[in-house]
Amino acid sequence: MDSLTDFYERIQPLQTSFASIVPFQAFSDKLLAMDFTAKNDIWRKEVVENVALFATTVNGVLRQAKAKYGIGGYLEHRNIYARSSVFDGTAPRRIHLGIDIWGREGTPVMAPLAGTVHSFAFNKAYGDYGATIILTHHIHELQFYSLYGHLALKSLSRVSEEQLIKRGENFAWLGVP
């Protein structure tokens, strides 16, 4: 596999076989696309540098929109990463490399596809993922990973490396950021 485009072309036809990652009723639950870029003035410095205030602000935005989940975008340029050096390697990283699902603490997290636990850890550095589980998936000779961060700590005590996780299995719970 040479590129993200190749990956997308191989995985896209399979998307209808994915299980929901969180409990979701398509006809009644509202999703809110959330903009975590610098263009959104709600993410002022004092908000993004205070985890509790950030969480309260996101929860307030969801409540106001009457949304069950907030969805953060893939490849979004996020200045929020500047608050921590965790993602600064040879150059600072500001591009979001995943899709966020923001919901109530304790919300069950399910595997979209069958897989195995690749690794799990509590990444405690400021601005890091907190309780994190990475699953390995294999589909038609295609191997890829899915990362679940900001989980409830109890999630880490319920998994082990190489543990098989079934499609749709509740293997973790959302935590706080």
How would you label these PLM feature ranges?
Residues I101, T132-L135, K166-P177:
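Short hydrophobic beta/alpha edge segments that flank linear recognition/processing sites
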Residues M1-D100, R104:
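Polar/charged, compositionally biased leader and regulatory segments
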Residues G103, A152-V159:
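Short alpha-helix capping/helix-loop boundary micro-motifs
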Residues P92-L97, A131, Q143-S146, I165-G168:
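Glycine-rich, flexible loop segments associated with nucleotide phosphate handling
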Residues G72, L97, A114, Y129, ...:
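Short glycine-rich loop/turn motifs that provide flexible caps or phosphate-binding loops at active sites
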